[in-house]
C-alpha cells in the first residue's frame, strides 16, 4: 500500500485547507484508493497496484510505503495519531471514507481487507484499554480550551453549527456551570433540535450577528465551505468576545484578530489541550501498541493468503486459455478427418509441453528454490 499524508503535525490547519481535495473530483481522477479527510488530516491510501496519474499532485504530502503505511492506518484508527489522543470520531471518519470509496467502486479487495482490519483494531483498542476515557474529542477539547483561557462559569455560550462536531461541543458543555447556551445553524430545525437537548435556545442563522453580540464565547463548528464570520460582521460588536473556530474549512476569517475586543482560537491552539490529554493517556499507549502489533500480524497473514488466492486465480485463467486454444486446434484436426485417438494423444502432449516450456521460461535464480519446493510437494502428493 502507498500512503500520501498531511496533518496537524506538519501543517497549520489554514495550510491544510489549501491541500484538501474535492472528493467527487478526486475520485473521477483516481481508482484503487481511499481518501480520508478530517478537520486536521488528509490521507490518501492507494492499492499497491494503483496507477498514480499525477505524482506532482502529492508533492506537499509525506509518502509512506508498504507495511509502514498499513501500520499507520491501524495507529490512526486506534486514536494514537490524533491531536486528541484516543478520540473516538476517527473510527467513524475512516469507516465513512472507506464506505464512500466502496460505493464509488474505487476500492480493491486488498484495500477492503486493510480498512476493515483497521476499523476492527480501533474498536478493539477502545474496548480493551482506557485510551478514550475523559476529554477525547475535538469538541470537548474546544470546551476545555475555553475553560482554561477565559473560564465558563456564568458565561453565555453560542455554538455555531449543529453537525457531528457541534454536537460533541454541546455534550461537553452540558456538564459545565454555564448561564445559557444558544445554537445557530443554517438549517434552523437542526439548531432547534440540538438546543432542545441542551435546554438552550436556537436562533435563526440570519440573526447570527445579534447572537454573537449577546454571548461571551462563540464556538464555531459548521460544515460551510468558506468563512461565515469576518471582520465586517464583528466590527460593531460590543464587549470582549472569545471565538473558538474548530471547523475545517475555517468558519472565522483571520482578519477578525484586527479587532481589539476579539480573541480568536483555532484548531492549532488545541495542541495545548492535546499535550495535557497525552500525559493522562501515556500509560495506556503500550497496551494499545500491543493490540496493534497483534492485529497487524493477523492482517499480514490475511494479505498473504489474499495474494496467494489471486496468484491461483491468475494461473487458473492462464491454464484455461491455453486449454481452449489447444482444444480448438484438436477439434479442427478431428473435423478434418484425423484419427481422434491420435489427435487426443497429440493434444495432451502439446498441452503438457506448453505448460512446462512457459513455466521454464519465467524461472530465474531468485525463484528456483521456491519452485523446487512446490514441485517436490506435487510429486509427493501425485495420484
Swiss-Prot record:
A biological process from GO: protoporphyrinogen IX biosynthetic process from glutamate
Sequence similarity: Belongs to the glutamyl-tRNA reductase family.
MF (Gene Ontology): glutamyl-tRNA reductase activity; NADP binding
InterPro entries attached to this UniProt entry: 4pyrrol_synth_GluRdtase, 4pyrrol_synth_GluRdtase_dimer, 4pyrrol_synth_GluRdtase_N, GluRdtase_dimer_dom_sf, GluRdtase_N_sf, NAD(P)-bd_dom_sf, Shikm_DH/Glu-tRNA_Rdtase
Cited NCBIfam families: hemA
One matching Pfam family: Shikimate_DH
Subunit structure, as described in the record: Homodimer.
Lineage: Archaea, Methanobacteriati, Methanobacteriota, Methanomada group, Methanococci
Record key words, sorted: NADP, Oxidoreductase, Porphyrin biosynthesis
Gene3D superfamilies given in the database record: Glutamyl-tRNA reductase, N-terminal domain, NAD(P)-binding Rossmann-like Domain
Protein's UniProt keywords contain Oxidoreductase: yes
UniProt remark on domains: Possesses an unusual extended V-shaped dimeric structure with each monomer consisting of three distinct domains arranged along a curved 'spinal' alpha-helix. The N-terminal catalytic domain specifically recognizes the glutamate moiety of the substrate. The second domain is the NADPH-binding domain, and the third C-terminal domain is responsible for dimerization.
Metabolic or biological pathway: Porphyrin-containing compound metabolism; protoporphyrin-IX biosynthesis; 5-aminolevulinate from L-glutamyl-tRNA(Glu): step 1/2
Described purpose of this protein according to its UniProt entry: Catalyzes the NADPH-dependent reduction of glutamyl-tRNA(Glu) to glutamate 1-semialdehyde (GSA).
Name of the protein in its database record: Glutamyl-tRNA reductase
Binding site for NADP(+): 161-166
Entry's EC annotation: 1.2.1.70
Amino acid at each position: 500500500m502507498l500512503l500520501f499524508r498531511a496533518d496537524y503535525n506538519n501543517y497549520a490547519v489554514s495550510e491544510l485547507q489549501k491541500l484538501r481535495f474535492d472528493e467527487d473530483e478526486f475520485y473521477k481522477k483516481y481508482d484503487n484508493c481511499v481518501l480520508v479527510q478530517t478537520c486536521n488530516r488528509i490521507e490518501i491510501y492507494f492499492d499497491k497496484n494503483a496507477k498514480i496519474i499525477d505524482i506532482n499532485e502529492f508533492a506537499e504530502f509525506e509518502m509512506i510505503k508498504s507495511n509502514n503505511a498499513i501500520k499507520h492506518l491501524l495507529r490512526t484508527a486506534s486514536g494514537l495519531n490524533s491531536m486528541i489522543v484516543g478520540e473516538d470520531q476517527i473510527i467513524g471518519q475512516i469507516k465513512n471514507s472507506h464506505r464512500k470509496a466502496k460505493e464509488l467502486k474505487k476500492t480493491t479487495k486488498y484495500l477492503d481487507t486493510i480498512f476493515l482490519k483497521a476499523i476492527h483494531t480501533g474498536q478493539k483498542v477502545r474496548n480493551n484499554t482506557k485510551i478514550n476515557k475523559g476529554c477525547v474529542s475535538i469538541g470537548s477539547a474546544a470546551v476545555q480550551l475555553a475553560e482554561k483561557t477565559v473560564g465558563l462559569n456564568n458565561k453565555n455560550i453560542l455554538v455555531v453549527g449543529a453537525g457531528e462536531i457541534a454536537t460533541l461541543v454541546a455534550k461537553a458543555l452540558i456538564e459545565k456551570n454555564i448561564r445559557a447556551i444558544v445554537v445557530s445553524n443554517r438549517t434552523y430545525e437542526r439548531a432547534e433540535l440540538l438546543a432542545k437537548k441542551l435546554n438552550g435556545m436556537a436562533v435563526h442563522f440570519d440573526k447570527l450577528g445579534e447572537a454573537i453580540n449577546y454571548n461571551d464565547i462563540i464556538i464555531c463548528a459548521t460544515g460551510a465551505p468558506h468563512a461565515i464570520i469576518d471582520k465586517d460582521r464583528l466590527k460593531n460588536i460590543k464587549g470582549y468576545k472569545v471565538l473558538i473556530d474548530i471547523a475545517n474549512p475555517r468558519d472565522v476569517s483571520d482578519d477578525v484578530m484586527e479587532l481589539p475586543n476579539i480573541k480568536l482560537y483555532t484548531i492549532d491552539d488545541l495542541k495545548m489541550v492535546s499535550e495535557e490529554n497525552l500525559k493522562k493517556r501515556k500509560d495506556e499507549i503500550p497496551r494499545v501498541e500491543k493490540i496493534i502489533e497483534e492485529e497487524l500480524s493477523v492482517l499480514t497473514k490475511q494479505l498473504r493468503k489474499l495474494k496467494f488466492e489471486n496468484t491461483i486465480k491468475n494461473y487458473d485463467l492462464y491454464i484455461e486459455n491455453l486449454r481452449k486454444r489447444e482444444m480448438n486446434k484438436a477439434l479442427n484436426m478431428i473435423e478434418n478427418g484425423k484419427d481422434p485417438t491420435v489427435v487426443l494423444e497429440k493434444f495432451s502432449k502439446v498441452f503438457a509441453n506448453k505448460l512446462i516450456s512457459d513455466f521454464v521460461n519465467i524461472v530465474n535464480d531468485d525463484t528456483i528454490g521456491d519452485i523446487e519446493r512446490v514441485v517436490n510437494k506435487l510429486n509427493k502428493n501425485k495420484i
